[in-house]
């Protein structure tokens, strides 16, 4: 650059000779003083401005957090009248449920984003991939290979059906082909042992609740083809689902007969599939309601196989059913021999008693039609487009969706569900900030400490039970992010999937291979000890978990992200996000189910009679509170306060513990800077971030479904119910007494 004029002036060489110095005039003196004063004022103002702190955080992370909160909320709504609208009104205006989704919320958006990461890491093979990762990528490619899947039609399924005694409605001369060799023991066992499909009788190997280091055989009622036993009323809001279900059966039977070039008698198809529906209705009515199955002490009934034979004799196809033969048909596939002295835990004795008269009314053909159908219906979406489309009306009736999930999304989820450690490794390497592990460890320690301190406040619990509750809380083991082995131990990861070998053009066979592998692995556990260090979740999951049998809490890498957590966001948001989730999972150890298990994970009554009675009384308050919520999206049905009790107790306890932990943080570290653009303090931001986790909505069909099947209250009621019980919330938002969000009667368990 050239010199400035001032520089040129200063450095002019031809400087004139100075004149004789003169006195300053009064005006010059006055002006000089004024200039000096103005200079001092200017310098002071600049210094003050440079050091002035307006208490607002202006970092990019604070700006992002504030923008997210502002976008989601409706500041014109009254927080003390409807905090769901206040916290989520903006979100509801900006978002529409995608055609492929049955519900849509902030949780679902996080899951959608995680699926994008999975797609990116699964679709590109790399030369440095270890064998386990190569297999995961092959499985993914086989799943998205729609041209190969479509070209095969229903052929892969047709080849498999003879292995499960066929499907009578889609088989010519079934009685001649299979009838003579058919036995109930073999037919029911074959689906279970090979493919993990439990129809009519649900036999599985799981942890022994009363001795949680051991595995034991369990016998329980089966799952149903429709979402819950209520659907089988087939009237009112359930009528469309029942019609679509039978039509779905008929459509698939027709497709198979067409592909097999067999004659099609529409009347016969309708007759047989309606018979299947009649049978399944009777089975549904024999099952116990969920609210009658929520006490693990009452559910647990251990007996020998010989006692089962005596207590629950069945007659099928005119022959007595041998429980010993049935169990051996299953366990022999993993070379385990069973005698009549084998211990079995029966979860559903009433169901088995009611099953007896039902089974005598139906032929082997009827029973096999149901069993094969229940197997087939799970596999239809793995076949060609024609088969997939036969499910459209059924999917719409249950979920309200008019389009299938994008193939790549479905496939990313499928691979993650079947190879969670291989996929977890890829996800962690691509997207997980490892330093967050230590921060979350510290948060867990703080919230656990608050839980223990809070025990002193509980007037309904005696000292003896408090002491045992403290011991259990201290014994809770935490798992954060991911198991180190999945990243550091290549051999262990490769060995986990050693038996699996996928082909890129055989997606259906790959699925069958996974079913067999998974079921065999589970059955083999019968003679093995429970590995209590095993993680109960993969890493690439947006969720958190508590295991009563392990007394373990798990926070996978997938949930350790905003709005739940970020090392860079305000602590009020972290405590209202992941802090509440931590408190929620800890409290699960003391909800209506978890409280029945001791610090070692065993089903043991460690409560005094008085404390147990008081717990039930305290809980009843929440049963009534949530049971009084009416959900417009589910046709005005009321929530089930009994089925959702455990989650509601955990929500309320978790929020209270996280808030007290945040107050402790402020006492120790001082107030945080406020967020820009929000006229809210950090106590208010704590509650706002908690609420915004649950922003979302449902399709009416899925609302009807989830109100009967989901143990969680819908998101809006998780916000309202929990905050109605929080005096700290009402104090933070200055809610007058008896406003909707600040009722006089408040429920508290923990």
Curated annotation (Swiss-Prot):
Domain Peptidase M13: 56-750
Catalytic activity, reaction form: Preferential cleavage of polypeptides between hydrophobic residues, particularly with Phe or Tyr at P1'; substance P + H2O = substance P(1-9) + L-Leu-L-Met-NH2; substance P + H2O = substance P(1-7) + L-Phe-Gly-L-Leu-L-Met-NH2; neurotensin + H2O = neurotensin(1-11) + L-isoleucyl-L-leucine
Binding site for a peptide: 103
Motif (Stop-transfer sequence) on chain: 16-23
Keyword Chaperone: no
Named cofactor requirement(s): Zn(2+)
Keywords noted in UniProt: Cell membrane, Disulfide bond, Glycoprotein, Hydrolase, Lipoprotein, Membrane, Metal-binding, Metalloprotease, Myristate, Phosphoprotein, Protease, Signal-anchor, Transmembrane, Transmembrane helix, Zinc
Cofactor note: Binds 1 zinc ion per subunit.
Compositionally biased residues, Polar residues: 1-14
Known glycosylation sites: 145, 285, 311, 325, 335, 628
Subcellular location field: Cell membrane
Stored CDD domains: M13
Pfam family, one: Peptidase_M13
Lipid positions (N-myristoyl glycine): 2
GO function term, MF aspect, one: zinc ion binding
EC number: 3.4.24.11
GO biological process: amyloid-beta clearance by cellular catabolic process; amyloid-beta metabolic process; angiotensin maturation; bradykinin catabolic process; cellular response to cytokine stimulus; cellular response to UV-A; cellular response to UV-B; creatinine metabolic process
Residue ranges, Cytoplasmic side: 2-28
PROSITE patterns: NEPRILYSIN, ZINC_PROTEASE
Protein family (similarity comment): Belongs to the peptidase M13 family.
Record-given protein name: Neprilysin
Gene from which this protein is expressed: MME
């Amino acid at each position: 650059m050239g010199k400035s004029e001032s520089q040129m002036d200063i450095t002019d060489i031809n400087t004139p000779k100075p004149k004789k110095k003169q006195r300053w005039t009064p005006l010059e003196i006055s002006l000089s003083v004024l200039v000096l004063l103005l200079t001092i004022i200017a310098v002071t103002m600049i210094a003050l401005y440079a050091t002035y702190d307006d208490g607002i955080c202006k970092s990019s992370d604070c700006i992002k957090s504030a923008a997210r909160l502002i976008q989601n909320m409706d500041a014109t709504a009254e927080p003390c009248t409807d905090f769901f609208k206040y916290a989520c009104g903006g979100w509801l205006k900006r978002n529409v449920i995608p055609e492929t989704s049955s519900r849509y919320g902030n949780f679902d958006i996080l899951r959608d984003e995680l699926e994008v990461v999975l797609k990116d890491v699964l679709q590109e093979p790399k030369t440095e991939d270890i064998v386990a990762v190569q297999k995961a990528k092959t499985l993914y490619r086989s799943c998205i290979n729609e041209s190969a899947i479509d070209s095969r039609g229903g052929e892969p399924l047709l080849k498999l059906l003879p292995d499960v005694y066929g499907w009578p409605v889609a088989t010519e001369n079934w009685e001649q082909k299979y009838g003579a060799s058919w036995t109930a023991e073999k037919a029911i066992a074959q689906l279970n042992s090979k493919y993990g499909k439990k129809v009519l009788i649900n036999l599985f190997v799981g942890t022994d609740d009363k001795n949680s280091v051991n595995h034991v055989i369990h016998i329980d009622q089966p799952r149903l083809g429709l979402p819950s036993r209520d659907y089988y009323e087939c009237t009112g809001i359930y009528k469309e689902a029942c019609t679509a279900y039978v039509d779905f059966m008929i459509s698939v039977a027709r497709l198979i007969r067409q592909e097999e070039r067999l004659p099609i008698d529409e009347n016969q198809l309708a007759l047989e599939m309606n018979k299947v529906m009649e049978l399944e209705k009777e089975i549904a009515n024999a099952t116990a309601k969920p609210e009658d199955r929520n006490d693990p002490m009452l559910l647990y009934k251990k007996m020998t196989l010989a006692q089962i034979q005596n207590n629950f004799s069945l007659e099928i196809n005119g022959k007595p059913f041998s429980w010993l033969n049935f169990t051996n048909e299953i366990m022999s596939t993993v070379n385990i021999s069973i005698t009549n002295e084998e211990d079995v835990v029966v979860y559903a004795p009433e169901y088995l008693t009611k099953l007896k008269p039902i089974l005598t009314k139906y032929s082997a053909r009827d029973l096999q039609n149901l069993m094969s159908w229940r197997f087939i219906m799970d596999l239809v979406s793995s076949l060609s487009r024609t088969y997939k489309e036969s499910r459209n009306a059924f999917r719409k009736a249950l979920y309200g969706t008019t389009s299938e999930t994008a193939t790549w999304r479905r496939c990313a989820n499928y691979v993650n569900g079947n190879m969670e450690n291989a996929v977890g490794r890829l996800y962690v390497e691509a997207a997980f900030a490892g330093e967050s592990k230590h921060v979350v460890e510290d948060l867990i320690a703080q919230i656990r400490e608050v839980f223990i301190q809070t025990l002193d406040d509980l007037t309904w619990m005696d000292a003896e039970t408090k002491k045992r509750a403290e011991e259990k809380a201290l014994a809770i083991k935490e798992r954060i992010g991911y198991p180190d082995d999945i990243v550091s131990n290549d051999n262990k990861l490769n060995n986990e999937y050693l038996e699996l070998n996928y082909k890129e053009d055989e997606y259906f066979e790959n699925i069958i291979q996974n079913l067999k592998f998974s079921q065999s692995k589970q059955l083999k556990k019968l003679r093995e000890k429970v590995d209590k260090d095993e993680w109960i979740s993969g890493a690439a999951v947006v969720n958190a978990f508590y295991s009563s049998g392990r007394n373990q809490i798990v926070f996978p890498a997938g949930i350790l992200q905003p709005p739940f957590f970020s090392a860079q966001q305000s602590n009020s948001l972290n405590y209202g996000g992941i802090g509440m989730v931590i408190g929620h999972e800890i409290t699960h150890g003391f909800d209506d189910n978890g409280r029945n298990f001791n610090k070692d994970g065993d089903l043991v009554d460690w409560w005094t009679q008085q404390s147990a009675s008081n717990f039930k009384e305290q809980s009843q308050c929440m049963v009534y509170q949530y049971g009084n919520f009416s959900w417009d999206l589910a046709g005005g049905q009321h929530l089930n306060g009994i089925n959702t009790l455990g989650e509601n107790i955990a929500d309320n306890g978790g929020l209270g513990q996280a808030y007290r932990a945040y107050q402790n943080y402020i006492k120790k570290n001082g107030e945080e800077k406020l967020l820009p653009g929000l006229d809210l303090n950090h106590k208010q931001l704590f509650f706002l971030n908690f609420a915004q986790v649950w922003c979302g909505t449902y399709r009416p069909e899925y609302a009807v479904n989830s109100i009967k099947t989901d143990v969680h209250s819908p998101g809006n009621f998780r916000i309202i119910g929990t905050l109605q019980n929080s005096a700290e919330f009402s104090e933070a938002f200055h809610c007058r007494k008896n406003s909707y969000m600040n009722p006089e009667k408040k429920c508290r368990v923990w």
